[in-house]
A protein has these predicted regions:
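A beta-strand-loop signature enriched in Asp, Gly, Thr, and Trp
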Residues: 13, 313-341
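Short helix-loop-beta junction
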Residues: 139-146, 230-233, 310-326
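Glycine/aspartate-rich loop-and-adjacent alpha/beta segment that forms the canonical ThDP
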Residues: 1-92, 273-289
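Glycine-/acidic-rich phosphate or pyrophosphate-binding loops and their flanking alpha/beta elements
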Residues: 105-113, 249-261, 270-317, 337-341
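Short glycine/threonine-rich loop-to-helix capping motif typified by GTGT followed
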Residues: 5-12, 134-138, 334-341
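Hydrophobic alpha-helical scaffolding
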Residues: 18-25, 36, 40, 44, ...
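Glycine-rich beta-alpha junction loops
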Residues: 1-3, 54, 213-215, 266-271, ...
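Thiamine diphosphate
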Residues: 77-265, 269-270
Length: 341
């Protein structure tokens, strides 16, 4: 029971005095003190001493706060505090290649990161024995056990919050949204817990949220959204959206290494339709570096995800169009130099 509002502007005039009196009699602090007295565990002298120590601690810390210089908000300082510092370390791939699909590249990259990071936990609906609806984690339980590959209830807000808790304990977490649409029920912990944790209290949010998204697979309006725009303007989040298997594997490794929260979008229509030669070893790719897929003088096309393939098909059907084609790969950070250059 709340005896007063949670902040200065919240009043209690609407609460009957009788109700306040009834709950005041149940005050656990007062009752605990009375219990200690009755058990002869707390003398009057001890009580006075404890209260003096508490008041002294409060006064000392208040003085420290009041003696500090006035806070000056400087734009550069504010922006520098949005993300936890991350020093990207490039890991080059080996020369052995395998022609695989986008879905295979994501699965392979996730598995290799599980092997690299003992403290990495994957969570999501039906991802354990069943292997997830897209089978990306198929066989992971046998390889890593159910403590690290965890089925979750249908409660996205709880799953994202649990991932944040793992990060605070020094672990890493990858959350699979069964479909990107479902992130709406976990929106608050994504944009208010994960995104703001470093800016507010210097705490990392070492969480990757995998987001199977997009239409063209007959999944209907509640399983086909491409909702990356919800997050690209939320300070503290990073947003990745690869179009090719090679990029997906390397960018996923970087996302898991990054101590900041990353939303990793995967267009479902590309899962089993796009093939590419991909290195078999573990490797990383940097965020914020777009790929120039085609050079031309007439027009510049900037896209990401499935849009890259739509552009490639259009240019193939219209050879008279001489265009630059830029694949952004990451939307936050955004490679503005590639766009405007």
């Amino acid at each position: 029971f709340r005896m007063r509002g949670h902040e200065e502007a919240s009043g209690t005039k609407y609460v009957p005095q009788e109700l306040l009196d009834r709950w005041a009699a149940k005050d656990p602090l007062e009752n605990y003190v009375e219990f200690l007295r009755n058990e002869q565990l707390l003398s009057e002298e001890d009580e006075v001493l404890i209260k003096k120590e508490i008041i002294h601690e409060i006064d000392e810390n208040l003085k420290m706060a009041f003696d500090e210089s006035e806070v000056e908000s400087i734009g550069s300082n504010e922006l520098n505090d949005v993300y936890k510092k991350f020093v990207y370390q490039e890991v080059s791939p080996n020369s052995e290649l395998r022609n695989i699909r986008l879905v295979d590249a994501i699965s392979e990259g996730l598995k290799q990161s599980m092997e690299k990071h003992d403290g990495l936990v994957i969570m999501g609906q039906d991802i354990a024995d069943y292997g997830g609806v897209f089978k990306i984690t198929d066989g992971f339980v046998e390889a890593f056990g159910k403590e690290r590959v965890r089925n979750t209830p249908i409660c996205e807000s709880a799953v994202v919050s649990a991932a944040m808790g793992l990060s605070i304990k020094g672990m890493k977490a990858v959350v699979e949204m069964q479909f990107a649409d479902f992130v709406s029920t976990g929106f608050n912990p994504v944009v208010n817990y994960l995104a703001k944790s470093h800016y507010r209290w210097n705490e990392k949010a070492d969480v990757v949220i995998r987001m199977p998204c997009g239409g063209d697979v007959g999944a209907g309006p509640f399983h086909s959204q491409t909702n990356e725009a919800w997050f690209t303007k939320t300070p503290g989040l990073k947003v990745v959206y690869p179009a090719f298997p090679y990029d997906a594997k390397g960018l996923l490794a970087t996302a898991i290494n990054d101590p900041n929260p990353v939303l990793f979008f995967e267009h479902k229509a590309l899962y089993r339709n796009i093939y590419q030669d991909v290195p078999t070893s573990y490797y990383t790719l940097p965020f914020g570096k777009a790929a120039l897929l085609k050079e031309g003088d007439d027009i510049t096309i900037v896209s990401y995800g499935a849009g890259v393939h739509w552009a490639m098909n259009t240019l193939k059907d219209h050879p008279e169009i001489n265009a630059d084609l830029i694949d952004l790969r990451t939307l936050m950070p955004l490679d503005t130099e590639a766009i405007y250059g």
